[in-house]
């Protein structure tokens, strides 16, 4: 009888939905899903760690611990082989320490795939998972290539029992695995590996539910799902639909769908009418046409619009396919898909191929990430070698002791150490913010030793930390406590070239053009106004510059949550009414934009 895995908490905690639900509501959703009968709740992964580190409110470990204390269902995490939750491979001792930290914080199920399907890269992590007593679910990524995807994955599956895997997961990040192929692949992998097989699928082609049912028919006994609003928005398999379909086929999943609809109602209250970029029809259509992850296509579209080149999206998508073929047909799972897309974007914008090579693509071609499924095009390999010195690939990744020394005492625990190892200065900034928050909590609590009151103070601090309010004051039973938002500005790390994750997007208050034709952009929240992504960086926009829809105008920080404010119209910035790093109120005028006509986007 097939069991279902729920990925709702992970999806709510990463882009493009990160920040839409307060932490308290996410924990409420987790408690509801805990009663639904899932085999596992997958609550974290690379996207969650990235979003949490950049938002600088709580550590990813704090989020996992908070969920663990509220649910009994086993918790899972999605990892990218030697990349773990980052964008660069890490050393073996960091891998081991990360797995140990995850297990100590309550993770029991580790879904682990190598972005290149080089399963030898799973050996160290697999051993660490086994040592920690976790379940090692080894993933194989399906991405359509030239020939032989099925045969290649079956051969890799034969190696997984020797690595200690307890289950094989077929992972389709693009939705290209049609039902009949899903049925064949699951059956062959199950026979070749002699292990149980699970099935994860996403993509805008619309075949996910049919592929999942075909996989179950072939013997898959674990299928990933999410609640209906997220399935619809992010092109996943709906738990409600799959459970009811299985029931109709006489294969009860044991799922209480009433609980799923209850969770869906909570989520819908927060994101029901707000647009999420991957759902845009033109993005979904292009993703399905080119067999690409919809989030990747959405990210490319954003970058092209920023360069006033939205009409070149199809040209870039064609180029992604060419670059992928020349790079040995690697799968499109993160971060490899982002690397290929970044290189293709450069080719189109520069109007020349391989005139510039990004470091990550160079590392991919030179083997730093592992062996690609097919041979690298010799011409491309030579071009990459000529464009860079031989030592472009760094020596072995930093060890734990190297990281500890460079952090200069900031890493006070193993879990902080591994965060710094993978996220560098961004993690260091997060840890400083968290320590400051803990200091404020301790100072407040020290003034009142009553345990019940102390807990209420902690909750009050969390409310201010998660919201955009400037100050909260309560008075009850003779106790008066006021918690005020700190006003000191904080910098942001550099944004990636192309990423499937983005900074939180705040809905702006952009009024319709009055008689003078100027659009007035007002602040949608109380916070601090930043004109640039980091101290010393150029501003997002200046007076006199032309902007396009979805182009970032500024950041509004509310309790260390950085929210992008984007243009809704194409036009020329006529005035900026707030200085950098100044506090703003709800509805305060920020920009005036004079609309201009632009060609429609593809």
Q: Which ranges hold each PLM region?
A:
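Catalytic cores of alpha/beta
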Residues: 151-156, 205-220
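Conserved, mostly hydrophobic/aromatic
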Residues: 12, 33, 112, 168, ...
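Structured functional modules or segments
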Residues: 500-602
């Amino acid at each position: 009888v097939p069991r279902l895995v729920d990925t709702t908490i992970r999806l709510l905690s990463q882009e493009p939905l990160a920040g839409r639900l307060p932490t308290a509501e996410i924990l409420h959703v987790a408690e509801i899903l805990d009663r639904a009968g899932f085999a596992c709740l997958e609550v974290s992964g690379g996207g969650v760690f990235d979003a949490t580190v950049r938002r600088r409110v709580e550590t990813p470990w704090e989020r996992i611990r908070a969920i663990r204390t509220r649910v009994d269902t086993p918790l899972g995490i999605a990892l990218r082989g030697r990349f773990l939750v980052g964008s660069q491979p890490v050393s073996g001792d960091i891998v081991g320490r990360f797995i140990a930290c995850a297990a100590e914080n309550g993770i029991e199920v580790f879904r682990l795939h190598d972005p290149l399907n080089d399963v030898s890269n799973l050996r160290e992590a697999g051993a660490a998972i086994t040592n920690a007593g976790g379940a090692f679910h080894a993933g194989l990524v399906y991405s359509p290539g030239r020939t032989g995807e099925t045969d290649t994955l079956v051969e890799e599956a034969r190696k997984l029992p020797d690595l200690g895997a307890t289950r094989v997961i077929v992972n389709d990040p693009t939705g290209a695995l049609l039902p009949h192929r899903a049925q064949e692949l699951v059956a062959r992998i199950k026979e070749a590996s002699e292990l149980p097989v699970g099935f994860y699928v996403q993509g805008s082609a619309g075949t996910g539910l049919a592929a999942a049912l075909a996989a179950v028919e072939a013997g898959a006994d674990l299928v990933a799902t999410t609640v209906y609003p997220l399935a619809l928005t992010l092109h996943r398999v709906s738990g409600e639909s799959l459970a009811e379909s299985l029931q109709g086929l006489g294969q009860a999943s044991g799922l209480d769908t009433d609980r799923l609809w209850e969770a869906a109602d909570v989520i819908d209250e927060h994101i029901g009418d707000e647009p999420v970029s991957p759902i845009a029809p033109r993005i979904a259509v292009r993703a399905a046409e080119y067999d690409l992850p919809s989030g990747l296509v959405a990210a490319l579209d954003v970058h092209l619009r920023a360069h006033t080149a939205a009409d070149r999206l199809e040209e870039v998508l064609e180029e992604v396919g060419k670059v992928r073929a020349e790079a040995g047909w690697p799968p499109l799972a993160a971060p490899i898909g982002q690397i290929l897309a970044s290189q293709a974007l450069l080719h189109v914008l520069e109007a020349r191929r391989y005139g510039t090579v990004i470091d990550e693509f160079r590392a991919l071609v030179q083997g730093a990430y592992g062996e690609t499924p097919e041979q690298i095009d010799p011409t491309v390999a030579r071009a990459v070698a000529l464009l860079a010195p031989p030592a472009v690939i760094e020596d072995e990744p930093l060890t734990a002791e190297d990281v500890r020394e460079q952090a200069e005492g900031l890493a006070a625990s193993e879990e902080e150490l591994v965060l710094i190892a993978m996220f560098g200065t961004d993690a260091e900034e997060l840890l400083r913010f968290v320590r400051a928050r803990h200091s404020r909590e301790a100072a407040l609590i020290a003034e009142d030793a009553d345990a019940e009151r102390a807990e209420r103070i902690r909750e009050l601090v969390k409310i201010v930390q998660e919201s955009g309010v400037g100050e909260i004051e309560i008075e009850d039973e003779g106790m008066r406590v006021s918690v005020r938002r700190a006003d000191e500005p904080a910098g942001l790390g550099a944004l990636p070239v192309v990423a499937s994750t983005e900074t939180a997007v705040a809905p702006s208050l952009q009024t319709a053009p009055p008689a003078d034709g100027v659009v007035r952009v007002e602040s949608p929240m109380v916070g601090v106004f930043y004109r640039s992504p980091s101290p010393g960086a150029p501003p997002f926009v200046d007076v006199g510059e032309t902007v396009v829809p979805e182009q970032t105008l500024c950041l509004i920080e509310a309790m260390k949550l950085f929210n992008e404010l984007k243009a809704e119209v194409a036009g020329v910035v006529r005035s900026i009414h707030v200085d950098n790093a100044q506090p703003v109120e709800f509805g305060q005028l920020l920009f005036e934009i004079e609309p201009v006509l632009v060609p429609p986007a593809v």
